[in-house]
Amino acid sequence: MAHRSRLSGLIIDCETGELLSAATFWSQALGLPVGGHEVGETSEYVGLEGTAAGLSVGLQRVTHPSRVHLDIEADDQDAEAARLEALGARRIGWVKRWWVMEAPTGHRFCIVKMDKPDEGPPPNAWT
């Protein structure tokens, strides 16, 4: 079945109890104003605004060492995971509403649901 995907986000994973302080640093470092702040039972996110159309940059509080990861959005997350597995990636697990994947190089990334397919750059079409 054909599906579409594209790069959607750059996520700065922060192993810290002070995510807003980290957001202030990255806001000033990147010249992007701090946006929305979302706190859940087990998660915390802060967005940065003013990025290129269709690309989000945000910070996420994590319990693992700090790093950066990419989000790839797809209209069919399972099909995209299978496509990337065929390229050598492996599924780490399903978390909330996305796949956590690992590239052959060891880099982790996520496959998230494509929310706004008509905004931003056109997605790649895969068959």
List the model feature ranges, each with a label.
Residues 16, 52, 65-66, 70-108:
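Vicinal oxygen chelate
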Residues 1-23, 68, 72, 115-127:
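N-terminal beta-strand motif that seeds the catalytic metal site of vicinal oxygen chelate
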Residues 8, 44-46, 99:
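Extracytoplasmic/periplasmic beta-strand context in beta-sandwich domains
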Residues 41-42, 99-100, 121:
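Positions that flank functional sites
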Residues 2-4, 24-26, 40, 49-51, ...:
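A generic structural signal for short, solvent-exposed coil/turn residues
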Residues 30-68, 108-116:
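Conserved short beta-strand elements that form part of the metal-binding/catalytic scaffold
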Residues 17-33, 80-86:
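Amphipathic alpha-helical segments
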